[in-house]
């Protein structure tokens, strides 16, 4: 085991604070409408330019191990804010820095760290309740656009495209962000249920121009197994042929004789048919087949539940208004499933999302909800260069998370005003002793830090602005972009309540732990002994001089 270096008391806290300040100072220059960019060097390719707080924080690793511990703890604040709310990472970092700096001053003055922490926790819990009371529902498209614009660093084009995407696919719809090919942003909306499986044979194509299969009012046969024997399919094919309607087969696979016979029947015009593989793998495939069955009013033919393909009737088949199949994707539009059944399925998947532990599972379940409930929108980010593209994509993703958070928990006045109003409501809060009261005052002072930093980045006098905003009421605040005081909600400067709340909670949580630190332990750098001597060459006996 390597030898350890240990620091105690003030020595430890000073080093930790230095690390906190180095990281926070690099992150906080990005805050607000006039925040600056940070350039991040990469080991390969061009440097990355960003205004995303968590991207800056993740890049910072300090040489001094004690300083690095402080920096890593603040990095944790930014990462947690990003994971929970998807935005507010810079605000959380600024709050954590303010609480740690104020708190450690009180510790140096002889206050009890544990009581300070209890006071801070008490103030934050009260402030969170006040934030909830200040919160307004985010219901209109204009408000969604404003939240997106603010989160994308006052880029109104981003706010507009996110609001448009939400309008088209609904609040539950999936919105994804991709790198586009054009110079401007594009919005691509897929209505209905789309999954990433294309036709099994190009001979199914009936629209030569687009190279796709278009089926009008088809029956949909859902099978949870491989189909290789055509005899199993004959009863369903005959029933569909009599009804003179097309058929889409979605199965684990269709191969050999079965696929060849379907192709021949299709080409001869006996029955208009197409086959695709079922989406997903394993249990996820079974679940998605069931989703399609509920959406189209059909039944999954599965031997697990005692249903045989030979005995399938028209009643077992799903139906839709239209199906479009390309080489890569299948889209089912207007399935005839009952609305109550679809809503029940959506509620069931939502419950699974709450119970899921991995982000990957949550994302996949959320996609299934969207496919059942609304649709999928893809925002394709446009830019002139790859460096600009990456920077803009980061901002669009932040803005998208912020708008989702706003829809979920509502909105409060932006620009750091909500925290100042929450602090002013709890100014009379008392702890159990004087040291807890100091902790409460530390938290209240720290809650001004985001407004002060936004003002400082805009090149204005932070104390003057903070006093003016404190003297106001409600959503009265300072628009750093224009240098004007006024109603923040009317000026469209909004923050999602969830973002502000989680930034404060995570900052206080980690800062409280740092204030109560009394010792720090790290590995001593190992002394490098260099390469060992190679030693002389052994004698080569028997080789006398000639």
UniProtKB/Swiss-Prot annotation:
Q: Catalysed reaction per UniProt?
A: ATP + H2O + a folded polypeptide = ADP + phosphate + an unfolded polypeptide
Kindly give the Pfam families that the UniProt entry links to this protein: Cpn60_TCP1 (PF00118)
Q: Where in the cell is it found?
A: Cytoplasm
Q: Keyword annotations for this protein?
A: ATP-binding, Chaperone, Cytoplasm, Isomerase, Nucleotide-binding
Q: Which InterPro entries match?
A: Chaperonin_Cpn60_CS (IPR018370), Cpn60/GroEL (IPR001844), Cpn60/GroEL/TCP-1 (IPR002423), GroEL-like_apical_dom_sf (IPR027409), GROEL-like_equatorial_sf (IPR027413), TCP-1-like_intermed_sf (IPR027410)
From the UniProt record, give one GO term of the biological process aspect: protein refolding
**Is Isomerase given among the entry's keywords?**
yes
Molecular function (GO) terms listed?
ATP binding; ATP-dependent protein folding chaperone; isomerase activity; unfolded protein binding
Q: Name one GO cellular component term.
A: cytoplasm
UniProt EC number = 5.6.1.7
Detail which positions bind ATP: 30-33, 51, 87-91, 415, 479-481, 495
Q: What is its main location?
A: cytoplasm
Keyword Isomerase appears in the UniProt entry: yes
Q: Which family does it belong to?
A: Belongs to the chaperonin (HSP60) family.
Oligomer status and interactors: Forms a cylinder of 14 subunits composed of two heptameric rings stacked back-to-back. Interacts with the co-chaperonin GroES.
Q: Which PANTHER family match?
A: 60 KDA HEAT SHOCK PROTEIN, MITOCHONDRIAL (PTHR45633)
Descriptive protein name:
Chaperonin GroEL 1
Q: Which species is this record about?
A: Vibrio vulnificus (strain YJ016)
Gene name per UniProt: groEL1
